[in-house]
């Protein structure tokens, strides 16, 4: 079980809303979100309702300002509690529809291009576990939640291009 508290103002001030489950529309509870406290669980925050828009991964901890979670604005309109998984395995492909060179990984990778010498990554098959995909190396840039399923092209995980820099397992739940 997870617990997250959203605050309208920076530094955990102003109106707040406590949550322990997925919410597809947080708009009725607060108009803006400038700070967050995660008491338990791992969460993906979304800039828009219905789990759309920019995504932000948060684990247990205090985030006194939206820039602390790499946010572009104070807009948080939906959230997803990420289920626990004990094992992680993902296949990454050089081309769309699982074509081209394929590699399977089970650990974090801070710099995919250096490790695998692909210039782009066009499809993924998440076999086990939940992962955060980052647009740039060293876990920076836009973030995308990957859950166990197939992603035949970059549009399937919500990206506008096939630029992928790093990949991290979601493991820290408490």
Swiss-Prot record:
Name used for this protein in its record: Gamma-crystallin F
Family statement drawn from the similarity comment of this UniProt entry: Belongs to the beta/gamma-crystallin family.
Keywords, comma-separated and alphabetical: Eye lens protein, Repeat
Note: There are six different gamma crystallins identified in rat lens.
Function of the protein: Crystallins are the dominant structural components of the vertebrate eye lens.
Beta/gamma crystallin 'Greek key' domain location: 2-40, 41-83, 88-128, 129-171
Transmembrane portions of the chain: none
GO molecular function list: structural constituent of eye lens
One Pfam assignment: Crystall
Organism classification: Eukaryota, Metazoa, Chordata, Craniata, Vertebrata
